[in-house]
């Protein structure tokens, strides 16, 4: 068995990735979220597959097909609730995973980081097209508002929007193609995950100190397999509690009403995991400016490795940068709250200030703090 594990072409890859992989001995629970994201992806693909067997991507029957899944299909309600809340768990793990990368300087593995940013964008695109499929009020109007943002692109904007819609409004063609995208994108995500892991295993994992861990490595199995199993059980407990006891907690009540192009909901807003970006979009009273700020809010992650001016990798021994990091976290929570509020005072000004602070912390304050901490650590003899 040992020989097969180490010699068989496929088993050898699995062995080098999950069994005999040398891992730093001191990685904390913040390193669990990568494996949790893998589990989330598998859960989403499996539940999504079973939903796709019963769903119809037609404007006349989409809403009732979802109702049919919840009422008539064996455990359809559970599969649907797991899929909807699984998306929330996915994004929760994603945000923590990215936050961990920023805190401990994992972004200095540039290839891994850049593939990670592409993965984040792909997952966001998948979640957006998936939200349109139940064809409720918020599905329809969310699709209308967000796709309409592309009309801000000079010259080709309106043509591009109509091309994506497949007509002059969000209709049957739009729903059908969004279902096709929602089906194919998770498999593209799986391929990107493979590339992400390939680049990660070229360098090995980072660790909380940010120092070179080569002097003290342990095998991934059994140490981290058992640790990941514990993380999975905790996440599964939270997911199942959410899906069983309050499945509609994170959803929008408007989505219980079938899509109606003649009736606009009073407050159009996306799912909670997009609210921070939505708040940044709304904080600029100009269409093109808002779209650019929305893109920048995610794409700013790509330039983070270039903004690393400190001699230390991790924030573990950098108290000023730590304060800024947690200020950024609080700021993102504020933006999430603002994104769900109506466009009126005082929410407008709070959103604008939080948006400015978001970019200021990442682009200006954190690099400055890194330089300042280096300066404080320099020995100064009289």
Swiss-Prot record:
GO CC, one annotated term: respiratory chain complex III
Record-listed heme b b562 binding positions: 83, 182
Cofactor binding note: Binds 2 heme b groups non-covalently.
Pfam families the UniProt entry points to: Cytochrom_B_C, Cytochrome_B
Membrane topology, record value: Multi-pass membrane protein
Predominant place of localization: mitochondrion
PROSITE patterns documented for this protein: CYTB_CTER (PS51003), CYTB_NTER (PS51002)
Binding site for heme b b566: 97, 196
Residues binding a ubiquinone, per UniProt: 201
Signal peptide range in chain numbering: none
Lineage top rank: taxon: Eukaryota
Stretches that traverse the bilayer: 33-53, 77-98, 113-133, 178-198, 226-246, 288-308, 320-340, 347-367
Subcellular location: Mitochondrion inner membrane
InterPro entries assigned to the protein according to its UniProt record, in alphabetical order: Cyt_b/b6_C (IPR005798), Cyt_b/b6_C_sf (IPR036150), Cyt_b/b6_N (IPR005797), Cytb/b6-like_sf (IPR027387), Cytochrome_b (IPR030689), Cytochrome_b_C_euk/bac (IPR048260), Cytochrome_b_N_euk/bac (IPR048259), Di-haem_cyt_TM (IPR016174)
Cofactor: heme b
Gene Ontology molecular functions: metal ion binding; ubiquinol-cytochrome-c reductase activity
Record keywords: Electron transport, Heme, Iron, Membrane, Metal-binding, Mitochondrion, Mitochondrion inner membrane, Respiratory chain, Transmembrane, Transmembrane helix, Transport, Ubiquinone
Family according to the record: Belongs to the cytochrome b family.
Free-text function comment from the UniProt entry: Component of the ubiquinol-cytochrome c reductase complex (complex III or cytochrome b-c1 complex) that is part of the mitochondrial respiratory chain. The b-c1 complex mediates electron transfer from ubiquinol to cytochrome c. Contributes to the generation of a proton gradient across the mitochondrial membrane that is then used for ATP synthesis.
Miscellaneous comment as given in the Swiss-Prot or TrEMBL entry: Heme 1 (or BL or b562) is low-potential and absorbs at about 562 nm, and heme 2 (or BH or b566) is high-potential and absorbs at about 566 nm.
Protein name per its UniProtKB record: Cytochrome b
Organism of origin: Micoureus regina
Gene: MT-CYB
């Amino acid at each position: 068995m040992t020989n097969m594990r180490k010699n068989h072409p496929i088993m050898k890859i699995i062995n080098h990735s999950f069994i005999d992989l040398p891992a730093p001995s001191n990685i904390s629970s913040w390193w669990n979220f990568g494996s949790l994201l893998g589990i989330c992806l598998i859960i989403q693909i499996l539940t999504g597959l079973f939903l796709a067997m019963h769903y119809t991507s037609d404007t006349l029957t989409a809403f009732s097909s979802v109702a049919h899944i919840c009422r008539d299909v064996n455990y359809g309600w559970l599969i649907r609730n797991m899929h909807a809340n699984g998306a929330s768990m996915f994004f929760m793990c994603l945000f923590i995973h990215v936050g961990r990368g920023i805190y401990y300087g994992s972004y200095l593995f540039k290839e891994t980081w850049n593939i990670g940013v592409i993965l984040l964008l792909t997952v966001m695109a998948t979640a957006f097209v998936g939200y349109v499929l139940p064809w409720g009020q918020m599905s329809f109007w969310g699709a209308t508002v967000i796709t309409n943002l592309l009309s801000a692109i000079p010259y080709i904007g309106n043509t591009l929007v109509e091309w994506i819609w497949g007509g002059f409004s969000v209709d049957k063609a739009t729903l059908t193609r969004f279902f096709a995208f929602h089906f194919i994108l998770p498999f593209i995500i799986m391929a990107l995950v493979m590339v992400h892991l390939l680049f990660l295993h070229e360098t090995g994992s980072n660790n909380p100190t940010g120092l070179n861990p080569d002097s003290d490595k342990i095998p991934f199995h059994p140490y981290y397999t058992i640790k990941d199993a514990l993380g999975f059980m905790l996440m599964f407990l939270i997911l199942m509690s959410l899906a069983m006891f309050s499945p509609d907690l994170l959803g929008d009540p408007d989505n219980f009403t079938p899509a109606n192009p003649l009736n606009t909901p009073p407050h159009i807003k996306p799912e909670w995991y997009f609210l921070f970006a939505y708040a940044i979009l709304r904080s600029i009273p100009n269409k093109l400016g808002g779209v650019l700020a929305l893109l920048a809010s995610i794409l700013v992650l790509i330039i983070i490795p270039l903004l690393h001016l400190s001699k230390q990798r991790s924030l573990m021994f950098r108290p000023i940068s730590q304060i800024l990091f947690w200020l950024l976290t609080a700021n993102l929570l504020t933006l999430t709250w603002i994104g769900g509020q109506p466009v009126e005072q005082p929410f407008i000004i709070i959103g604008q200030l939080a948006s400015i602070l978001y970019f200021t912390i990442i682009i200006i304050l954190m690099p400055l703090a890194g330089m300042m901490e280096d300066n404080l650590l320099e020995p100064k003899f009289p």
